[in-house]
């Protein structure tokens, strides 16, 4: 009774004798091999990537301490599973994974990219604190934990519209959810957003 109905098949699948994991990817760092995998549940917000570690590419592997290392359960577009980890030309580590939408199809997804790295204990991590906000990409070495330069200003702010279709109200334009949206009831519709104070706006 504690679980939402849509989560029950996922939990049952995890505790059967035939669970499934997919999306293997391996990186080598400081003599260790990091075997990454996608946890079950691409259609859920908790879709994530885990990692095993070994001194040999053929194992034996040990489950890392900080699993899942790629996990983004909320925000505009949740989910962070079935991905790859790679260095750019400046020596920065990045992790890409798929993020859930599941509106037009159960497995409808998009690709997200986040800063990643290895901590002092050799644990692979992925910084998803502001996981779906813009992140600057430069041609220099950067701190994987630095905050984004741009912040979300519109979340749940006051909004008006010329009209709307039922179920597509103006408030859905600022609810930080990729699966909902405002839709005008006419061809020449408009939307007005009040940020309630003056801001330096960089993107709409």
Model regions and ranges:
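Surface loop/turn signatures of beta-propeller and other carbohydrate-active proteins
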Residues: 1-27, 60-84, 127-145
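Short loop/turn segments immediately following beta-strands, especially the blade-tip
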Residues: 1-3, 52-60, 117-124
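Hydrophobic core segments of beta-strands in well-ordered, beta-rich domains
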Residues: 22-41, 92-100
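Structural WD40 beta-propeller signal
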Residues: 27-29, 86-88, 119
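Structural motif
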Residues: 44-51, 104-113
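Repeat-solenoid scaffold signature
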Residues: 70-110
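Disordered, acidic Ser/Thr/Pro-rich linker "stalks" and the adjacent N-terminal cap
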Residues: 135-198
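A short beta-strand element within beta-rich, extracytoplasmic domains
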Residues: 200-204
């Amino acid at each position: 009774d504690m679980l939402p109905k849509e989560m029950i098949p996922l939990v049952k699948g995890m505790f059967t004798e035939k669970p499934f994991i997919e999306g293997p990817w391996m990186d080598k760092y400081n003599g260790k091999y990091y075997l990454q995998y996608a946890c079950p549940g691409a259609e859920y917000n908790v879709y994530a990537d885990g990692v095993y570690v070994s001194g040999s590419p053929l194992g034996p592997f040990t489950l890392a301490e900080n699993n899942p290392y790629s996990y983004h359960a909320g925000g505009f577009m949740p989910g962070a599973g079935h991905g790859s980890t790679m260095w750019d030309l400046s020596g920065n580590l990045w992790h890409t994974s798929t993020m859930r939408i599941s509106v037009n199809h159960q497995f409808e997804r998009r690709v997200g990219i986040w800063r990643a790295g290895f901590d002092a204990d050799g644990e692979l991590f992925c910084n998803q604190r502001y996981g779906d906000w813009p992140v600057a990409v430069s041609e220099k070495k950067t701190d994987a934990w630095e905050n984004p330069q741009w912040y979300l200003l519109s979340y749940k702010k006051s909004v008006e519209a010329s009209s709307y279709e039922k179920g597509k109200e103006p408030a859905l334009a600022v609810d930080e959810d990729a699966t909902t949206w405002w839709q005008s009831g006419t061809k020449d519709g408009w939307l007005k957003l009040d940020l309630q104070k003056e801001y330096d706006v960089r993107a709409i």
